């Protein structure tokens, strides 16, 4: 039996804040998979959700060269926004459109082995 290489798509967080965009995108994915069945991995952003949550909590969000600088005390909020809110919004839409998603974060199941590239960016 031959395994298919999964199609990997990286989504920007703007997809989650633009009305109707996620519904439209997932609908397109569903139609694509009907015609071309294969494993699919969606990697999502959610910086807008992180920014909104930090602002609501009275915390500042600092960026350096367009990348978020994340102090240790903000990690629970960043994880909540990305692995919680963003992930579950995408899963709910996929389920509503008849797909069978599994939501994971990079911390699940030893999926990633990471090395900090620059300590100036904090804990992400």
Please give the residue ranges for each predicted region.
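Nucleotide/pyrophosphate-binding catalytic subdomain
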Residues: 1-124
